[in-house]
């Protein structure tokens, strides 16, 4: 009989603990009403992303859609002043990085929404060069070599179904397929 009383007592303790836990959790709930935004507010939301510091860490390269479409901007770290570097009204331009040791800029963009993104170099005077000019080529920046004298990228220029890995010398702009 003593054993049966102990089992009943343990069962009551377990039930009491579960009921207490349930009541505690139930008392903690709050009614949440999410903020509602108009469609105008939703579309007026500016986005900023990416980010690459200049070698001297005085500038930050980003992309933003504050002009209505993504363009490349440069932010002065000391003042916070933002300078628009590209002025596209049609294609989105995405900041990649500064060319090592310079103020030249790498960015990517497609043409007319064809989703064949190329890698471009913007010189300090604002002129640009398509570094991956293949007509049906899609290219993506993959990083810098340790010595910062070459960049790596993937491209489907050999075969549209496959992306190969390339290394491009940033002094001669010649590329070689690695894999």
What is each PLM-predicted segment?
Residues 25-27:
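C-terminal motif of bacterial Sec signal peptides marking the signal peptidase cleavage site
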């Amino acid at each position: 009989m003593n054993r049966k009383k102990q089992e009943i007592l343990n069962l009551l303790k377990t039930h009491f603990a579960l009921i207490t836990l349930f009541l505690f959790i139930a008392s903690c709930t709050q009614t949440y009403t999410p903020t509602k935004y108009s469609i105008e507010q939703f579309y007026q939301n500016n986005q900023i992303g990416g980010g690459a510091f200049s070698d001297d860490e005085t500038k930050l390269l980003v992309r933003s859609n504050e002009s209505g479409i993504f363009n490349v901007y440069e932010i002065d770290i000391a003042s916070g002043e933002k300078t628009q570097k590209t002025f596209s009204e049609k294609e989105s331009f995405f900041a990649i990085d500064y060319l090592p040791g310079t103020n030249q800029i790498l960015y990517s963009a497609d043409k007319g929404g064809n989703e064949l993104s190329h890698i471009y170099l913007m010189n300090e005077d604002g002129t640009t060069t398509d570094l991956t000019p293949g007509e049906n080529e899609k290219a993506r920046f993959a990083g810098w070599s340790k010595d910062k004298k070459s960049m790596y990228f993937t491209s489907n220029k050999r075969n549209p179904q496959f992306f190969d890995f390339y290394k491009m010398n940033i002094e001669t702009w010649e590329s070689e397929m690695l894999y």
